[in-house]
């Protein structure tokens, strides 16, 4: 277990170092110093968009997955999941454009669009994880007199957690990768570096925004994996 953890840490460190090397080579120290204030400010705005939309996605997605996995919902759960699947086929840019038409420009439509983009993996994996809990465990929980709430909290959720965490990690990666597009509807993010870099053929600025986004995604995914191992060290 310790060897596996060490390999993961080493692999992550190598990836970070390679990205930093590409980062410095691509933009130069002068560009990094000139854009330092922008990088910090846009990083805070990017974090705000991701964390706010993920908070609401978790707040809605996990309870929805739990409700759909209950025996009373078996008859229509698959139909509801199909609706989520159809919604997920929409490109992120189309979702952002739709949110802009309905709500306007700024942070609010961006958060709504990122929330919708992140929702499906959380609902799907929560539902799949709970449905995959062995029937023998549920029967054993019923046999010792657990209530439905106790069974869910002490038996089903702990066993479904690895699958649920996988969905949360996927949703976070989608969210972080989509957040730069929020620049197109008036929300501040690393897109303010990426898209002007494309329009103006400014390669250093483009690399600065893209690398910052990639590092952000890697760091968040690593933190989520560590958090998952802390909660369930024998299964994650």
Curated annotation (Swiss-Prot):
Main location per UniProt?
Answer: membrane
> Quick one: a GO biological-process term for this protein?
transmembrane transport
> What triggers expression?
Induced by osmotic stress. Part of the osmU operon, which consists of four genes (osmV, osmW, osmX and osmY).
Query: Which residue numbers delimit the ABC transmembrane type-1 domain?
Result: 43-224
Question: Which PROSITE patterns has this protein been placed in?
Answer: ABC_TM1
So which domain of life are we looking at? Answer: Bacteria
Protein localization? Cell inner membrane
Q: What happens when the gene is disrupted?
A: Deletion of the osmU operon eliminates the residual osmoprotection by glycine betaine in a mutant that is lacking the ProP and the ProU systems. OsmU deletion has no effect on the utilization of glycine betaine as an osmoprotectant when ProP or ProU are functional.
Residues spanning the membrane: 9-29, 47-67, 95-115, 126-146, 180-200, 207-227
| Keywords attached to this entry | Cell inner membrane, Cell membrane, Membrane, Transmembrane, Transmembrane helix, Transport
List, alphabetically, the InterPro entries matched: ABC_transp_perm/SBD (IPR051204), MetI-like (IPR000515), MetI-like_sf (IPR035906)
Question: Per UniProt, what is the membrane topology?
Answer: Multi-pass membrane protein
Q: Name one GO cellular component term.
A: plasma membrane
User: Which PANTHER family does the entry mention?
Assistant: GLYCINE BETAINE/L-PROLINE TRANSPORT SYSTEM PERMEASE PROTEIN PROW (PTHR30177), OSMOPROTECTANT IMPORT PERMEASE PROTEIN OSMW (PTHR30177:SF4)
Q: What does this protein do?
A: Part of the OsmU ABC transporter complex, which is involved in the uptake of osmoprotectants such as choline-O-sulfate and glycine betaine. Probably responsible for the translocation of the substrate across the membrane.
Listed name of the protein: Osmoprotectant import permease protein OsmY
Q: Which source organism does the UniProt entry give?
A: Salmonella typhimurium (strain LT2 / SGSC1412 / ATCC 700720)
